């Protein structure tokens, strides 16, 4: 294979999956086949999409009810020749799912890239090992927290929040994805002030924290804004990838003048992936494609919290981010939303140690503030790695957190 194989979930009311698959393969490549003269068939053969797999799935009454008709469900795989498209994500997505995405009854499940095609994508600049080297933390999950309530607040408020989170033992603090360029906390001011705070905490407490700053603006201004952030001392760039496009992420990741890790936020991705019947699967969108395009971190809804993904989907995202691939470094999985210390054993059990535990309210909502919240998480992480049940840990910060949010991990065995 020199091109790409697309895997689709299809719903066919004609109940002929093979015919439907062939129609898609032709419609997204040469348009027709059987009515072409033999000579023209020979000329176009190398451009023709080829159906390589058709698998019928069990009938699903809920799907029939939603679509208001009886359909046959199936998984099909189609190979698209590399000759048909340039080796970039806009061309690949348009080839494999462009007009097909308008069907409303087809979901793009996966894309399998040939080795030849993979060579055109950067992958993460730092990856898991590179991030761990920056922090000098190699033996546990990382802990990340989020600035909360920053809109309408000034630099002084940001510095106080950042200091408390860092003292609490948080490894990475990220901007809220809805914090854009503004008069009260402009980009470079946030970075310079944040670096001063984090250096002070490091000198006093010996704990290193990185700050992920949200790089925003018009598309054609992004590179310049990212370079301004780097020049000001940015540790990590947070990026709302799906408000801009995967190719924009790749452009940032490939730029040698932007030599910092990139953290991909999933904002807007639900518009592509939320439906079980159509769109693009979350593992492909938030896992494989983000990694190929250059994300060092991928945030996605956890299976446990307030905006939960099904566990199978979340684990599939993580698999795509972390599986061995000679072409790409591994990206950090960041299962997010509604995370509190009681979920830590679940996260480590399901995602392993190479994960970023990301919390907002679970840190800021602690009765002892963000310092207490961070310490509660760090204690929960250490206890879990020692296979010690959280309710047996004698720690006031963790005990307070479990009283507020509960301890659903009481029966978890690692």
From Swiss-Prot:
It comes from the Bacteria. The active site is at residue 99. Substrate binds at residues 148, 174-177, 265, 338, 360-361. Mg(2+) binds at residues 174, 176-177. It is an enzyme of class 5 (isomerase). One of its GO terms (biological process) is carbon fixation. Pathway: Amino-acid biosynthesis; L-methionine biosynthesis via salvage pathway; L-methionine from S-methyl-5-thio-alpha-D-ribose 1-phosphate: step 3/6. Binds 1 Mg(2+) ion per subunit. InterPro entries: Diketo-Methiopentyl-P_enolase, RuBisCO, RuBisCO_lsu_C, RuBisCO_lsu_C_sf, RuBisCO_lsu_fd_N, RuBisCO_lsu_N_sf. Gene3D superfamilies: Ribulose bisphosphate carboxylase, large subunit, C-terminal domain (3.20.20.110), RuBisCO large subunit, N-terminal domain (3.30.70.150). The modification N6-carboxylysine is found at residue 174. Its EC number is 5.3.2.5. It catalyses: 5-methylsulfanyl-2,3-dioxopentyl phosphate = 2-hydroxy-5-methylsulfanyl-3-oxopent-1-enyl phosphate. The keyword DNA-binding does not apply. Its cofactor is Mg(2+). GO terms for molecular function: 2,3-diketo-5-methylthiopentyl-1-phosphate enolase activity; magnesium ion binding; ribulose-bisphosphate carboxylase activity. Keywords: Amino-acid biosynthesis, Isomerase, Magnesium, Metal-binding, Methionine biosynthesis. Homodimer. Belongs to the RuBisCO large chain family. Type IV subfamily. PANTHER family: RIBULOSE BISPHOSPHATE CARBOXYLASE, RIBULOSE BISPHOSPHATE CARBOXYLASE LARGE CHAIN. HAMAP family: Salvage_MtnW. Catalyzes the enolization of 2,3-diketo-5-methylthiopentyl-1-phosphate (DK-MTP-1-P) into 2-hydroxy-3-keto-5-methylthiopentenyl-1-phosphate (HK-MTPenyl-1-P). Has no RuBP-carboxylation activity. This is 2,3-diketo-5-methylthiopentyl-1-phosphate enolase. It comes from Bacillus thuringiensis subsp. konkukian (strain 97-27). The gene is mtnW.
């Amino acid at each position: 294979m020199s091109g790409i194989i697309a895997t689709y979930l299809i719903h066919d009311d004609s109940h002929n999956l093979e015919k439907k698959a062939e129609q898609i393969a032709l419609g997204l490549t040469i348009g027709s086949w059987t009515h072409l003269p033999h000579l023209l068939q020979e000329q176009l053969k190398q451009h023709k999409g080829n159906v390589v797999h058709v698998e019928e799935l069990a009938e699903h009454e809920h799907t029939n009810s939603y679509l208001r008709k009886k359909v046959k469900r199936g998984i099909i795989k189609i190979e698209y020749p590399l000759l048909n498209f340039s080796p970039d994500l806009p061309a690949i997505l348009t080839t494999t799912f462009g007009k097909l995405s308008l069907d409303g009854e087809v979901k793009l499940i996966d894309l399998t890239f040939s080795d030849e095609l993979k060579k055109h994508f950067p992958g993460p600049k730092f990856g898991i090992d590179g991030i761990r080297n920056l922090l000098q933390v190699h033996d546990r999950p990382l802990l990340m927290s989020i600035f909360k309530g920053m809109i309408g607040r000034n630099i002084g408020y940001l510095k106080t929040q950042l200091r408390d989170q860092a003292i609490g033992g948080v490894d990475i603090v990220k901007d809220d994805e809805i914090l854009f360029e503004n008069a009260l906390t402009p980009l470079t001011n946030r970075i310079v002030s944040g670096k001063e705070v984090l250096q002070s905490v490091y000198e006093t407490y010996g704990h290193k924290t990185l700050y992920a700053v949200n790089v925003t603006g018009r598309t054609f201004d992004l590179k310049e804004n990212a370079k301004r952030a780097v020049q000001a001392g940015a540790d990590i760039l947070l990026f709302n990838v799906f408000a801009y496009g995967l190719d924009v992420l790749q452009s940032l990741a490939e730029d040698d003048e932007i030599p910092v890790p990139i953290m991909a936020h999933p904002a807007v991705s639900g518009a592509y992936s939320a439906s079980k019947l159509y769109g693009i699967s979350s593992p492909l969108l938030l896992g494989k494609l983000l990694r190929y395009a250059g994300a060092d971190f991928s945030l996605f809804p956890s299976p446990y919290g307030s905006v939960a993904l099904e566990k199978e989907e979340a684990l599939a995202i993580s698999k795509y981010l972390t599986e061995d691939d000679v072409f790409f470094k591994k990206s950090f999985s960041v299962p997010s939303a509604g995370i509190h210390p009681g979920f830590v054993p679940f996260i480590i059990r399901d995602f392993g140690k190479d994960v970023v535990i990301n919390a907002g309210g679970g840190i800021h909502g602690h009765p002892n503030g963000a310092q207490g919240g961070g310490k509660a998480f760090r204690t929960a992480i250490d206890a879990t790695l020692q296979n010690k049940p959280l309710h047996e840990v004698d720690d006031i910060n963790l005990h307070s957190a479990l009283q507020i949010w509960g301890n659903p991990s009481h029966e978890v065995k690692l």
